[in-house]
Amino acid sequence: MHDSDRQKTILAILGPTASGKSALAFSIAKEINAEIISADSRQIYRELNIGTAKPSQETLRQIKHHFVNELSIGDPFTAGNFAREASARIRNILHSGKNVLIAGGSTLYLEALLNGFADLPPADTEKRQQLAIELETFGSKHLFERLRQLDPLQAATLDHTKTQRLVRSLEIIELSGHTVTEMQKKHIQPLADINVITCGLSLPRPLLYEKINRRTDQMLASGLLQEAVALFTKYYPYCDVITTNALQTVGYQELFAYLDEKTDFKTAITLIKQHTRNYAKRQLTFFKNRLNVNWMDAPENEHELSMLTTSCCRMITGN
């Protein structure tokens, strides 16, 4: 295999939250001179730190992590934005002679980057407000009938009472002049010319849940509540006008409910652990149904981490 061919092979390290993928990616990156593409839709926000298990400043100093600390809460950024930008950066890194790792567990980001996405226009606040007024004035059946006339195939997939997708479908038509059905046929494959080896970290469900619970306790000991208080004070009164899901992140939303006196502290912590476990289940379902993953046992100690690092490095370098 020629060096130019090797540069076309990259490794994606996936796994449910708390499975150890970040530590493995960091270990591999140090060995093969790689930069990391973080496929984490929450670590990209500067304001979210402890609750997102963001890499330490020392880790970020040693290895370049892309899409970490790059946006502020409220900055619009879609899975399509991520896939386009990540694809461009991956090519630039490979062109420079370095290796690339993808590491993360955000399903929408991974779906767009690894499986491709429809090139839909970004949300338009003014157009969406116009449709919202029309919805309130004439009702969802009126909008649904309009969509049925314009894009019957898309309308057939919708329940007219689920107004978010209904409004988005009409917004796309009015912004682009094309139906959603037409747009989805123009599927973009960001990494079609690059060989991506997808590896997933697997561990027994009871052990995963134990790690999730223990990590939640560690986050609290590291100041998660104090971080939530700062976010609550600065952003919570404006949640309705901030167009991001960042503030609905598990670990923060439960503490916001506590700070808003809608629940007690003990219940909030219980819910953080429960919701994180539920999130891990959804991630595993996605990995198994949507991606072709080579599953590996998650390392439980430094020796196993070292052995797995060596094995993964060989997948990329061929040595």
Curated annotation (Swiss-Prot):
**Where exactly is the site Interaction with substrate tRNA?**
S106, R128
Its domain of life reads Bacteria
Catalytic activity annotation:
adenosine(37) in tRNA + dimethylallyl diphosphate = N(6)-dimethylallyladenosine(37) in tRNA + diphosphate
Is Transferase one of the keywords?
yes
Q: Which GO terms describe its biological process?
A: tRNA modification
Query: Where, by residue number, does substrate bind?
Result: T17, A18, S19, G20, K21, S22
Task performed by this protein: Catalyzes the transfer of a dimethylallyl group onto the adenine at position 37 in tRNAs that read codons beginning with uridine, leading to the formation of N6-(dimethylallyl)adenosine (i(6)A).
User: Can you name this protein?
Assistant: tRNA dimethylallyltransferase
Tell me the organism. Answer: Chlorobium phaeobacteroides (strain DSM 266 / SMG 266 / 2430)
Lineage of origin: Bacteria, Pseudomonadati, Chlorobiota, Chlorobiia, Chlorobiales
Question: Source gene?
Answer: miaA
